[in-house]
A protein has these predicted regions:
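Bacterial N-terminal signal peptides that target proteins for export
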Residues: 4-29
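Sec/Tat signal peptide C-region and signal peptidase I cleavage site
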Residues: 39-45
Length: 286
């Protein structure tokens, strides 16, 4: 009996040690992500009408805030940069932070993400930035490997519609065809902004092969349903301060996988903004 009890205690100790190990956590993380990505019970044909309505209402408040923000040189960036933050940005650092979203309960079956990132491009101007961002066909060059294809569909002055095929790689690779409605505006020659709203997001199956096709809604992973991107940029200190705010809608985390998948989902927007800002700074240096 004592030997049996001792063996059980030894086994418990080994399991506890395993759970604390980084390898065990990584294994659970990967299993959870693969389950999240592959489980047919997780797939949703489309975001619910309630989720879309909540997303649209949230976007309306964001755009109202930005419209007011863009009417004055004071506080053109939000929040206003402190001297310490300006120094960090001028040293090449990025400032990336979440913007408090509405509660998840208001989005049945979906998650809303709102993140903001700021960078500084020495020597760049508002004109340089707009020239870069309006050159849609060059996006695969400047924003590789995320942007695979890009082209302007229609353009009237500072308003255009664009197509982009994008790739997201996080454990699994997802390729999507997207279209955006984009508008550029200026307060003056040193202060500008742009609004980009997704009008279509479709996941592609077997991309780049003879079997390439648009996936039916009920076969999509739901990693991205909606995405709006807002740029704010102003000249100062011999360069250009650039701020991007990204508001997106994706499917929710299945019950029981929150503790594994949630950190991964929160990591995606941060890494996406970091990639976009770094790539933009690099392109402006060329």
């Amino acid at each position: 009996m004592q030997q049996g009890e001792g063996a059980r205690n030894k086994l418990k100790l080994q399991l506890m040690t395993l759970r604390r190990s980084s390898k065990f956590r990584i294994l659970c993380f990967i299993i959870g992500l693969l389950t999240f990505a592959a489980s047919p019970n997780c797939a949703k044909a489309d975001p619910t009408p309630e989720a879309v309505s909540a997303f649209n209402a949230y976007v309306k408040t964001v755009e109202s805030r930005l419209a007011q923000q863009h009417q004055s040189r004071n506080g053109f960036l939000a929040p206003p940069l402190t001297p310490q933050n300006e120094k960090l940005l001028q040293q090449g650092e990025l400032i990336i932070e979440p913007v408090t979203p509405i509660t998840g309960s208001a989005l049945p079956g979906a998650l809303l993400h709102d993140w903001r990132g700021t960078a500084f491009a020495p020597g760049a101007t508002v004109a340089d930035f707009e020239r870069l961002m309006k050159n849609i066909s060059a996006y695969p060059q400047h924003f590789s490997p995320q942007v695979l294809q890009a082209k302007v569909l229609t353009q009237q002055g500072d308003h255009l519609q664009a197509f982009m095929r994008v790739r997201q790689k996080h454990v699994i690779t997802v390729v999507m065809d997207t279209t955006y409605d984009i508008t550029f505006g200026r307060l003056d020659d040193q202060h500008g902004y742009s609004l980009s709203r997704s009008t279509r997001v479709s996941e592609i199956g077997s991309p780049g092969t003879a079997e390439e096709h648009t996936l039916p809604a009920d076969e999509e992973h739901g990693f991205l349903w909606r995405q709006n991107t807002y740029w704010t940029y102003e000249e100062g200190d011999g360069g250009l301060y650039m701020q991007i705010e990204s508001v997106s809608l994706s499917r929710s985390v299945p019950n029981g996988l929150n503790w594994i998948v949630q950190p991964f989902i929160e990591k995606i927007p941060r890494e996406s903004l970091e990639f976009t800002l770094r790539s933009t700074c690099n392109a402006l240096r060329k």
